[in-house]
Amino acid sequence: HSGSHAGYYPDALQMSIKITFSPADGKLLGAQIVGYSGVDKRIDEFSQVIKHNGTVYDLMALEQAYAPPFSSAKDPVAVTGYVAGNILNGKMQPLYWRELQVADWSKVTLVDVRTPDEFALGALKGAVNIPLDDMRDRMKEIPRDKPVYLYCGVGLRGYLASNILLQNGYKEVKNLIGGLKLYKAATTPLPEPKEFSNYGSSSSDSSKVDHSEHSKDSAE
C-alpha cells in the first residue's frame, strides 16, 4: 500500500498493489492495482516491464517524473520492487493472510507493532502489542522457541521490526504482507447485493412491492 502522491498534499490516497513474479529469477508476470488517482500511470509502468520481460529488480530502477502533487518521492512501483526483492533475497519472510487464518496459535507468537492507540482501535485476536519504537527494549517479552508473526498497518513497520528481531538472534520471523489493512480487506465478508429487479417499474408496481416487503417484515 503506497500513497498516490506526497502525503503532505491534500487528497493523497493509498493504492493497493499486487504483483506476481517468478520465485526463480524475479521475472514479473502480472500486476493489479486498486485505488484512485495515479492508478493508470502505475499500471502502465508495470505493463512496460512485463512487455520487455523485466523483473522485480527493474521496478526498483525505473525513473519516474516526480512532483509532490502527483507522485511520491519513493514511487509505489519502486516500493513494490523493494518488497519483492526483499522476499527473493531472503531479507524478509512473508506471511500471507491465508496462512494467518489457519495458524495454530499455540505454536506461534503474534505481535502487533503498531502504536498503543492504533492497537486500542482494533487488533487481531491473540496479538500482543509491542510498538516498533519499543521493540529493542521489550523483545525479551517475545519467546525465542517458536515462530514470531508480526503485523502493522500496511507492512512497513512489520518489516522493520522483523529486521530488529533477526539481527538479535530470532530464527523464524514472518511479516504479514499488506498488514492489517489487506487482512481485513481479504477476510471481511462482502455485503449482500441489493435486489434491483423492480427498478424502473410503475408507481403502482412499486406500491405493491413496498406492501409485500412491509408484510414480510411484520410477520417476522
What is the meaning of each model-derived region?
Residues 1-24:
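Structured beta-strand/loop patches that form or line metal/cofactor-binding pockets in enzymes
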Residues 1-2, 114-116:
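Histidine- and/or cysteine-centered catalytic micro-motif in compact active-site loops
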Residues 3-7, 32-40, 67-69:
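Glycine-rich phosphate/pyrophosphate-binding beta-alpha loops
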Residues 27-28:
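Hydrophobic "anchor" residues
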Residues 37-56:
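A short, polar/charged loop-to-alpha-helix boundary motif
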